[in-house]
């Protein structure tokens, strides 16, 4: 999972996961994201923001993120959906390939 938020709006859909190591569900969600990435490949940007990372405060403030949030962006970089973990790989694939 990539940490380069500059990829949002690069013409590909993006999903950003707010990973918090203090939440057990974060590891489960990361596993499901990796499963989805194996199926979808490079046609979607799978990105991660670590909760508590001060270098990402602007992003977290702009989108009012919380730990375990999943933010879905279209290819133009517009936020189109937000969910809270846990989403299974199948659900992620469905959301990202429609």
Where are these regions (language model features)?
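Structural micro-motif
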Residues: 62-72
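Typically the conserved alpha-helix immediately C-terminal to a functionally engaged Cys/Sec
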Residues: 25-40
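Short active-site neighborhood of thiol/selenol oxidoreductases, capturing the structured segment around
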Residues: 9-22
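Thiol-based oxidoreductase modules, predominantly thioredoxin-like and allied folds used
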Residues: 18, 41-56
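N-terminal leader/targeting and pre-domain segments
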Residues: 1-11
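Second-shell loop/turn segments in exported
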Residues: 19-24, 79-82
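Non-catalytic, surface beta->alpha helical segment in thiol-disulfide oxidoreductase systems
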Residues: 72-98
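Stable alpha-helical elements in mature extracytoplasmic
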Residues: 4, 29-32, 88, 92-95
